[in-house]
Amino acid sequence: EVRLFQVIKTMEELKEWFMGLIHEYVKWARYLYHNAQRRDESLKDLEFPFPYREGQRELAVSVYRTEARRRKLFIQAPTGIGKTLSTVFPSLKAIGEGHGDKLFYLTAKTITRGVAEEAFAILREQGLYFRSVTITAKDKLCFLEKPECNPDACPYAKGHFDRVNDAVYEIVHKEFGITREVILKYAEKFKVCPFEYCLDISSFVDGIICDYNYVFDPDVRLKRYFADGAKGEYIFLIDEAHNLVPRAREMYSAVLIKEDVLAAKRLVKDKSPRLTRQLERVNKIFLEMKR
């Protein structure tokens, strides 16, 4: 059903509305343009922060060439060689040369996300102009004891969209390493949902540090980057990629739990005899498999 509403406006009213709308877009376009300019300028002069260890320079060169040629590279290197900096540094150089728009650093563990944050911080001390955000799971960002994502239950969800643009604009003008703690500080200040805020911030930074799920899991992946029709020139650094195999199995596997089937059966017992019988059949199959 299509419903039409007719609203009559004067030319002056339309002009005022249009100029206000354009002003909002222009300030973001101006930010993105100048941010990319300053980022690329800083990358031209960026030097590796330490003397190269054995094998580090060869690794960095291989990473840069792979990204410039839009290929894939699998790296197996001993612990302690400095793989994080040796892959992040050439990836940033590749972005500076126009071989990518955004860097995704993917990890399986919280501790390795901290290593990536530290690598960016070290390079910023060398003059790097580069903003990054660490995406944290919703339940670890939520201010409530139990996440309830609706305006009636959560004061941060109520009016979120009225305040989030100003919140994003301020944080990307004041911060470079946008970690969980930084997000919580600004989310509290502006009274916005920290998780949704974090996702919106990701659209206006150059690097994203996150779990594998946000790229590979079909249910969790970031739709703004990976939905059908979404396009972008992205560079992916997958830390400890051997962990991706079992994680991918989990992402693409369904799970049925016997206790849940029995709980559902109890709920519908007096309401749907047919569904109750079907659930009982499922329960019997579980019992047969258990034998």
PLM ranges: what are they?
Residues 71-75, 101-103, 207-210, 234-236:
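Generic beta-sheet signal
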Residues 33-44, 99-208, 213-216:
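A substrate-engagement module of RecA-like helicase motors
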